[in-house]
């Protein structure tokens, strides 16, 4: 089934009816700005035989076949929008998505796979992508649909490393609190498609990557581990991440050996800037966390609130970020700084959670929970933390909301 677009915000205790409606409208505006179908429709249009992509024109008469590949939680919805534009011009396609994030398509196969930890289905689906891309020639056009979760969903370990090895290391990195940049530096050097290697495999075909960014600042080499962009990280960097989190001794030996061989120059590096693999590649970011945050601020101002975009570069432990945000809300309640009521503060970014024990949740639920005590007793105050892709960790929730009455 296709994932529901319904928005259900339940924790309204502590807010009067008017404020409830405002919170929901602001959240909906942010989500609409990140909507995958709408983003594709804004970026892709067909005029006769000319395909316009992010302002660049492609004459389809110059191509024999058009393929669609991709991976990510929003990539099925993106595929639907692409099919609506290109129809029967698509010769075939394959997209890996998270369980429950499927959609009805005709030319593009939608394949469910493991997320946030990859599973055997991720590998099977990635092999299908390789099969499509590998047969492409310089007369073919490949549309690559990338969105949040693409790193796990497009997983294909290098020879000699098993999925079990990869899963063990990924789990350790997640529990350690490693940043997405650090995790991607490791993944790129243990797999066959990440770090520009999909572009290298597709060359000399023309590649257009439509990208929904869930990463701070939207660096192309970080989003979904950058399958179509130059990789700035190295084997040495990947080894450094394992050392930083004391994982050398506990990581699977096959992984440590491979990274050490790469650091010694015995394994080819991922393609860097200037590599011929990128001569016919266009990377286009069609939606981002920053755009969602800006849309939220615009809606808040439209509703008559004093609104401020604090930052779209928020990082750190979710519980620590929660304390800072709660402190700012308390300052507004106490002194009207930095904004007088009625106020709306918006922040975007990517926090991390260091797992202690066996709890289930995600960074947004963790952040909201950590704000319960600091906000206790405040009237008409709410903190909403949500993932714009509709998924917060291994749960069916997008996030959570806390008010001044949640503790009671």
Question: Could you say what each language-model-derived stretch is?
Answer:
Residues 1-61, 77, 237, 246-271:
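N-terminal amphipathic/basic leader segments beginning at the initiator methionine
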Residues 59-62, 71-102:
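Active-site cofactor/substrate anionic-group-binding motifs, chiefly glycine-
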Residues 69-71, 94-97, 143-148, 174, ...:
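Short beta-strand segments
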Residues 81-90, 107-109, 157-168, 200-204, ...:
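A glycine- and small-aliphatic-rich helix-loop capping segment at beta-alpha/alpha-beta transitions
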Residues 96-138, 186-187:
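Glycine-rich oxoanion-binding loops at beta->alpha junctions
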Residues 159-172, 176-253, 257-258:
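Internal gly/pro-rich beta-alpha loop/helix module
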Residues 187, 205-208, 230-324, 328-333:
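Accessory alpha-helical/coil subdomains and C-terminal extensions
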Residues 310, 319-323, 334-335, 341-342, ...:
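Extended C-terminal subregions enriched in glycine
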